[in-house]
């Protein structure tokens, strides 16, 4: 008699976290695209975000399409301490690590590309290093949004990279990124309805194109 094949459990996010830095000077910068993604989700789902001292961030909860209860978080701890805020929410609500979806910027992906994964390393991203340290696992989903590399990047020239990630998108890039954020909402909604693994097929195979002028 053959053993029944057990299907892996669906990974459905319950807490969605966007990474960024809290000061106004960081608004609209490439490094804050995670914040922008959570703002886009909050608008799409009519969820109000408000500062929550206990959770060290801007926090809100509501219902996503399909009737899924969802929590949104923008840590206000600065990027390299993001995990503190994430852990504050997961501890309070007794959420597992794999129920947390973290959205953040990625230099290694070109503009218009996104990557959804079920687990993985921090890849040099300080916010993700903190998230992994505080959740004590790498096994949680993450959605990376491509911000591209600096045009004049020289290997080993960290100053060029820093000014790129902390710089703002050009007018043309801003148009493209608004479309990317719409696509991010689509990918996250698919994750909530069908699980992260199913959503990966859509999210990882599509490139958002700049609007034709």
Swiss-Prot record:
<keyword id="KW-0820">tRNA-binding</keyword>
<keyword id="KW-0963">Cytoplasm</keyword>
<comment type="similarity">
    <text>Belongs to the PTH family.</text>
</comment>
<protein>
    <recommendedName>
        <fullName>Peptidyl-tRNA hydrolase</fullName>
        <ecNumber>3.1.1.29</ecNumber>
    </recommendedName>
</protein>
<dbReference type="GO" id="GO:0004045">
    <property type="term" value="F:peptidyl-tRNA hydrolase activity"/>
</dbReference>
<feature type="binding site">
    <location>
        <position position="80"/>
    </location>
    <ligand>
        <name>tRNA</name>
    </ligand>
</feature>
<dbReference type="InterPro" id="IPR001328">
    <property type="entry name" value="Pept_tRNA_hydro"/>
</dbReference>
<feature type="active site" description="Proton acceptor">
    <location>
        <position position="31"/>
    </location>
</feature>
<feature type="site" description="Stabilizes the basic form of H active site to accept a proton">
    <location>
        <position position="105"/>
    </location>
</feature>
<dbReference type="InterPro" id="IPR036416">
    <property type="entry name" value="Pept_tRNA_hydro_sf"/>
</dbReference>
<feature type="site" description="Discriminates between blocked and unblocked aminoacyl-tRNA">
    <location>
        <position position="21"/>
    </location>
</feature>
<comment type="subunit">
    <text>Monomer.</text>
</comment>
<dbReference type="GO" id="GO:0072344">
    <property type="term" value="P:rescue of stalled ribosome"/>
</dbReference>
<dbReference type="Pfam" id="PF01195">
    <property type="entry name" value="Pept_tRNA_hydro"/>
</dbReference>
<feature type="binding site">
    <location>
        <position position="26"/>
    </location>
    <ligand>
        <name>tRNA</name>
    </ligand>
</feature>
<keyword id="KW-0378">Hydrolase</keyword>
<keyword id="KW-0694">RNA-binding</keyword>
<comment type="function">
    <text>Hydrolyzes ribosome-free peptidyl-tRNAs (with 1 or more amino acids incorporated), which drop off the ribosome during protein synthesis, or as a result of ribosome stalling.</text>
</comment>
<dbReference type="GO" id="GO:0005737">
    <property type="term" value="C:cytoplasm"/>
</dbReference>
<feature type="binding site">
    <location>
        <position position="126"/>
    </location>
    <ligand>
        <name>tRNA</name>
    </ligand>
</feature>
<comment type="function">
    <text>Catalyzes the release of premature peptidyl moieties from peptidyl-tRNA molecules trapped in stalled 50S ribosomal subunits, and thus maintains levels of free tRNAs and 50S ribosomes.</text>
</comment>
<dbReference type="GO" id="GO:0000049">
    <property type="term" value="F:tRNA binding"/>
</dbReference>
<dbReference type="InterPro" id="IPR018171">
    <property type="entry name" value="Pept_tRNA_hydro_CS"/>
</dbReference>
<dbReference type="GO" id="GO:0006515">
    <property type="term" value="P:protein quality control for misfolded or incompletely synthesized proteins"/>
</dbReference>
<feature type="binding site">
    <location>
        <position position="78"/>
    </location>
    <ligand>
        <name>tRNA</name>
    </ligand>
</feature>
